[in-house]
Amino acid sequence: MKHKLLTLAATMTAAILSGCCGGGCKDGKNYRIRDGVIVFNEPKPSAGQQDMLQFAADPIDTVRVGFIGLGMRGSSAVSRFTNIDGTRTVALCDLEEDRVKKSQKTLENAGKPEAAEYFGEDSWKRLCEQDDVNLVYICTPWDKHVEMAVYAMQHGKHVAVEVPAATSVAECWQLVDVAEQTRKHCMMLENCVYDFYELATLNMVQQGLFGEVLHAEGSYIHNLADFWDRYYDNWRLAFDQAHAGDVYATHGLGPDCQVLDIHRGDRMDYLVSMATVSVAGLELAKKNMGAETFANGDQTSTLIHTVNGKTILLQHNVYTPRPYDRMYQVVGTKGYAEKYPSPGFAFEPDQINGYADYENLSAHKFVPGDVYKELLKKYQSPIVKDIEEKAKSVGGHGGMDFIMDYRLVWCLRNGKPLDMDVYDAAEWSCIGDLSAASIENGSKPVLVPDFTRGKWNKIQGYRHSE
């Protein structure tokens, strides 16, 4: 088995060094297939371009935010920001004027100053050009994310962009290159890394309770039957209708990558993916869109291998009546975490001695409820200790949305590296395009691009700024 993995790694290395399109570029595709391995094209960086690893911008006293997209996610974000000190919402933008007015009313009700208003097809560009904006917060349909983020960075703004940050490998490279060229932050708004359970588990991993982490799992399993009609102009279903693969991997993948130190001592090397036939999805598209085809399988599964020999399993299913599940699991040599369907931990007993009745603990079963609660309390993440109650009060997926926004603002105001950088945005977002390529080619392995261009080992271990 080890010989096979080394052979595959050597094949992939040869493939990526073989040139941009030599060795069998697929017609109209951004990749080539060489010796059975799919390799996506990598653009060359501009002269003098530098990486953004651990990048910290000058401190910003007041984070002046311009929001683009005021639907479900954007309007909620405007409301949350009224509860964060050191911020001011200075611009609001949406296609629909009434949405802008509603968010303006949110500011008024919170006693905040009036924001500039933009509405219409290209009005977002004027928001990005507004002199007093220093952070552009993008909550639009996915196909607009990169165009808007790039324009904002090129006009001197830091960017926070909803998930997925990009929808293709080429777009991911565009985000990376423009962030490096402009020296502006580009953070994807992945809220699930701020869930209280995921944060506590990450802290336990960093404190050594799990031993060495070998495997992690994540998913987005969420029957969207109650939500499809709420997406403007049916944009989300239309995207799924046209795209195969795990198009929404970031909620499951983000927490996995943090416990595995991805591009901080390890990196994703290659993946294979497969999907079921589309039955429920096609039926939905026929009903809502009159479509006769549907590219996205009802259930998609992706297995990722890292350079250091770790693995990640992802699932995507938004069509069938499975209970909500992000499938968060962490498998270590000394411990195990599982959030769904019921959260729990299991450890070798000597990993957590000192707890009540610890001598009766067994690695063959989850710790008792009282020990579970003690562990969550003891290993609560330092970044939430002072804001937990406020986060739960303000809300947003149980508080994790508020923590995400609060941490973004805190890092910008204190001139610290953000909790998630542009490479996270690219790595977590590219899975859609990579998994689609694997599925469309009989589950062939796909090389995961190294968006750090060889710098993935520059930082040793994931850590939040303090």
Task: Tell what function each PLM region has.
Residues 1-9:
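Bacterial N-terminal signal peptides that target proteins for export
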Residues 17-19:
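C-terminal motif of bacterial Sec signal peptides marking the signal peptidase cleavage site
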Residues 21-110:
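N-terminal Rossmann-like dinucleotide-binding module
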Residues 25-39, 43-47, 53, 75-76, ...:
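C-terminal helical cap and adjacent loop that interface with cofactors, partners, or active-site loops
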Residues 115-138:
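A structured beta-alpha segment of the ubiquitous adenosine-cofactor-binding alpha/beta core
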Residues 135, 141-142, 146-194, 208:
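Beta-strand-loop-alpha-helix segment that lines the small-molecule cofactor/substrate pocket
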Residues 182-187, 192-295, 408:
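Predominantly a Rossmann-like dinucleotide-binding segment in NAD(P)-dependent oxidoreductases
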Residues 298, 314-325, 396-397:
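Glycine-rich phosphate/pyrophosphate-binding beta-alpha loops
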